[in-house]
A protein has these predicted regions:
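Conserved beta-strand hairpin/beta-sheet module of binuclear metal-dependent hydrolase folds
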Residues: 1-50, 154-165
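Conserved beta-strand segments of alpha/beta enzyme cores
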Residues: 2, 11, 53, 80, ...
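Residue-level marker for the onset of beta-strands and adjacent loop->beta junctions
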Residues: 9, 17-18, 122, 128-131, ...
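Divalent metal-coordination and catalytic microenvironments
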Residues: 9, 22, 33, 61, ...
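Short, basic/glycine-rich phosphate-binding loops at helix/coil junctions
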Residues: 22-27, 108-109, 168-174
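Metallo-beta-lactamase
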Residues: 36-37, 139-201
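Active-site HxH/HxHxD metal-binding segment of metal-dependent hydrolases
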Residues: 38, 45-131
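Glycine-rich phosphate-binding loop signature in dinucleotide/nucleotide-binding domains
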Residues: 49-52, 133-138, 198-199
Length: 201
């Protein structure tokens, strides 16, 4: 993955998916939406090239293409994890994940790697109504943007850069989807208006 500078200490790792990166100091960083397990090697290579170790992972929501690698970075690097309340509730256990993914059996939850990887301890839960967060020493703004997922959030870094998760989708993503997944269409449309009204860089 290619590390691209956005502004200040805010970067993005560009590859098959975009992974947010906030550099805390010369050797540590936060990852935002580290994506699927297919990206782990590429992320690690980009971090090694930059001399960075992830100490925290934040996710806008718990879908596999944003959250699946979270447990890996927690177990491998000791990175702290952070998700919004409802998303954290879903990934706390195999049972809670099964409750959310009702069309999968418990046997599938326990044996399909993509599903098993979603189950992960959450060190810092973003409570309802919480709009500011200090995570691994980094002050972040939290913008509630439900719709695509039940408790989707956006993160604004100290550089005033917004990581919008799946509130916004690229033309490539839209072209490849007959109908983009939305948990609640009315909420999703309201959230798009919220993001459009942000004064971020």
């Amino acid at each position: 993955m290619k590390r691209i500078h956005v502004k200040g200490n805010t970067w993005v790792l560009e590859g098959p998916q975009l992974v947010g990166l906030y550099q805390i100091d010369e050797s540590t960083c936060l990852l935002l939406d580290p994506g699927s397990t297919k990206l782990q090697g590429e992320i690690e290579a980009a971090l090694a090239q930059a001399g960075l170790t992830p100490v925290g992972v934040l996710c806008t929501h718990m879908h596999y293409d944003h959250h699946e690698s979270t447990r890996y970075f927690r177990e491998t690097y000791g990175a702290q994890t952070c998700l919004p309340q409802l998303e954290a509730d879903i990934v706390r256990s195999e049972e809670s994940l099964k409750n959310h993914l009702f069309n999968f059996t418990m046997g599938m939850i326990r044996t399909i790697p993509r599903l098993q990887n979603l189950v992960c301890p959450v060190d810092r839960v973003i409570a309802f109504g919480e709009t500011e967060l200090v995570f691994c020493g980094v002050p972040l703004q939290v913008v509630r943007t439900p719709g695509h997922a039940p408790d989707h959030v956006c993160f604004i870094t100290p550089d005033n850069v917004c990581f919008a998760g799946d509130v916004l989708m690229t033309e490539d993503v839209l072209a490849g989807a007959m109908v983009p997944f939305v948990f609640d269409m009315a909420d999703d449309l309201k959230s798009k208006e919220i993001v459009a009204g942000l004064s971020c860089d």
